[in-house]
Amino acid sequence: MIDSRRTDHAVVLGGSMAGLLAARVLADVFARVTVVERDRYPQAPQSRRGVPQAAHLHVLLMRGLDILKDLFPGIDGDLIGHGAVPIDTGADLKWLTPGGWGPQFHSGLRKLAFSRELLDWLVQRHLAARSNVHWRDGWEARSLLSAGGCVTGVRIHDGEHGEDLDADLVVDATGRRSRLTDWMRDAGFVAPAETVVTAFLGYSSRTYERPPGEERGWKAVFIQAAPPLSNRAGVLFPIEGNRWCCTLGGGNKEYPPQDEAEFLAFARSLRAPVLHEVISRARPLSPVATYRATENRWRLYHELAAPPEGLVAFGDSVCAFNPVYGQGITVAALGAVVLGQVLRSGAGGLPRRFYRELAAVVRSPWMLATSEDCRYPLAEGGRLTRGVRVMQKYVDRVVAVSCRDLTVRRLWLEVFHMLKPPSALFRPHILGRVVLGGA
């Protein structure tokens, strides 16, 4: 158990975005924070083996960006200084929804577009400036250390040598492929149950040259899938270095290809030609990268009667979402806020309190992601209850009305970016506009 008078050392397993966020809030409480990361950190923005999805488009929702700005002051300026592209989500995004083209209007809701490599590199640099954060890159965790029913540290290895790290708190942020539940069982602890929902979705991505100064009337385009009639989607966003990042997705096992010619053919098959028209004339800068680990997986730590003291699972290690909805980094950022609040409120029963608070944060994005995935006929794991069907129909109506009603559209964007809760869509003045078809 953490002694509030002796918060000496926290160890974070996994040094990708979730781990960096956890380390940031731990650094406010612990005298020393050690980040254990299997990969070596690069000296410049580049992909790492431990972030296999880095080649694909990453959308940082506006709520997530707000939290990053609070935790890492100046991060937005650094992103822009390295070429990130400001985007007004109303005016600059050309979005084909299942209900039609969304209106383009100046919303004042600004996000930034950039590569995952740039974001990870800048956040790690910000965190490395803190004198009480230490790095063990090139090492990975192998097992937990425990005594008296509590986790007391972790066994790490660099491929040649092993070492025991004692810790007052171990935070597992090793991602959706976390082995923490196995380590818990090996140490004699009860591991959580899990629930998995999959739409058998995969995606393929490629970067292209983006000539500066071109005027198109938009900066980014999103051709959304509309299952079950259309299971394919595509998104094209500008990123630093005068590049486009194009990601194509397909659910219901309609996986986009890795072959260059087939990649273009898949883009041509989308519900609108605009994305294909751009990339078919652009110069490719990378090979086609593919990714299929897209299931929604929630390990139900909050249901454990007595989770072990001295140990917290975090980020995708707890709940991993279908990446197509862009929720992962933002939910991890919200989790960091929760972890910081729980740490400041006292040491007793920290894991149990954290998991319960985190579950309240996870519940809405989980519901939105899984209810959308359940639209695909081959989806597994989700329950199409009457409540889910009612919600799907209401969301369909909201999206359709938002294509002609700017009040509903703006609110939908705010909910999508987690600036407002989904319950805002049911407020009387919005409910009336949705039911009556907009103003």
Segments (PLM) and residue ranges:
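Predominantly flavin-linked oxidoreductase catalytic cores and closely associated redox partners
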Residues: 129-271
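Helix-loop-beta segment of a Rossmann-like dinucleotide-binding subdomain
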Residues: 97-116, 248-251
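FAD/FMN-dependent oxidoreductases across multiple families
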Residues: 113, 242, 254-338, 342-365
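Short beta-strand to alpha-helix junction loop
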Residues: 59-60, 106-125, 179, 225, ...
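Residues in the short beta-alpha loop(s) of Rossmann-like NAD(P)-binding domains
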Residues: 39
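C-terminal helical "tail/cap" subdomain of flavin- and related membrane-associated enzymes
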Residues: 340-439
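N-terminal FAD cofactor-binding segment of flavoenzymes
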Residues: 25, 45-94
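N-terminal Rossmann-like FAD-binding beta1-loop-alpha1 element of flavoenzymes
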Residues: 5-36
